[in-house]
Regions:
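An N-terminal hydrophobic leader/cap segment in hydrolases
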Residues: 2-46
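Membrane-embedded segments
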Residues: 48-125
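Alpha/beta-hydrolase fold nucleophile elbow
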Residues: 130-141
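Hydrolase active-site cap/lid region
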Residues: 144-199
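Short beta-strand/loop motif that positions the catalytic acidic residue
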Residues: 197, 203-205, 209
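Conserved alpha/beta-hydrolase "acid-adjacent" motif
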Residues: 210-216
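Catalytic active-site module of serine/aspartate enzymes centered on a nucleophile-bearing elbow/loop
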Residues: 244-261
């Protein structure tokens, strides 16, 4: 009897508290002052009653367009924002947004639909200043599911995915095969949503990735041949983001799909 009851309690715990397993936010005090080498603006976007998402935007002189970046399941903008020069030095503004509960953003993530709805509100706010044809979506790790959703439901200039998965639920099932699939509420089905994406798509993935296997990137490429896939030898989950080879390659992709004003 105990052997039957214990798994039930474990599965119930995973179902109702899986956000704590998936999302690992680092909170920052409301009066925290970001410090970056580049000039930036701190912004706050109201996404729900009393819920504000905090972000930082870096602006370039050329103003070719803007990169809207969605980060992974850990950290906050105090670290992520340090990558801004990769885009600004090549003529693109970049906006880094925190999800609910991350950094100085209020609220908590409670569902996939809520996560994606918030992202759409952020995207819509950018449309007040930029044409959709000037918006580049950039996703890192779990953020690639958010970026892909927006690309599938809007008309951005292009979509750049780093450290990808074909379906987040599939990753969870790979990591915890003993847990029934219906327990997982966060599907984030990248493979399915890419079918509705019309803009250019680029994928960057470390071949030694132990979090999301490189096979996920290969699956996406096989199912969507027009994707430009770049695999990095001897790199893991996201450490290639700091490498010169990645920086050079992404500049090539940005120029290949250069925005026409």
């Amino acid at each position: 009897m105990i052997l039957f009851i214990v798994p039930i309690f474990i599965f119930l715990g995973l179902y109702f508290f899986q956000e704590k397993l998936i999302f690992k936010p680092t909170k920052l005090a409301e009066n925290y002052k970001f410090q970056f080498d580049e000039k930036f603006e701190e912004i706050n976007i109201l996404v729900d009653k009393k819920v504000i998402l905090n972000g930082v935007i870096f602006r370039s002189e050329a103003k070719k367009g803007i990169v809207l970046s969605f980060h992974g399941n850990k950290g906050n903008l105090s670290e992520i924002g340090k990558r801004s020069s990769l885009f600004t030095e090549n003529g693109y503004d970049v906006l880094y947004m925190n999800y609910r509960g991350y950094g100085k953003s209020s609220g908590t993530i409670k569902s996939e639909s809520q996560l994606l709805k918030d992202a759409q509100i952020v995207y819509d706010s950018l449309k007040k200043e930029y044409k959709e044809s000037q918006i580049i979506l950039f996703g890192i790790s779990i953020g690639i599911g958010v970026a892909t959703y927006l690309a599938a439901h809007n008309n951005p200039h292009s979509l750049i995915l780093t450290a990808t998965y074909s379906s987040f639920k599939k990753v969870l099932k790979e990591k915890l095969p003993f847990v029934p699939g219906f327990i997982w509420k966060y599907e984030l089905n990248t493979n399915k949503r890419l079918q509705k994406v019309n803009c250019p798509i680029s994928i960057f993935h470390g071949k030694e990735d132990l979090v999301f296997s490189f096979k996920h990137a290969q699956t996406l490429k096989e199912n969507h041949p027009r994707i430009h896939l770049f695999g990095f030898e001897k790199y893991g989950h996201t450490n290639f983001l700091e490498s010169n080879i990645f920086k050079k390659r992404i500049i090539v992709e940005l120029n290949r799909n250069s925005i026409q004003k």
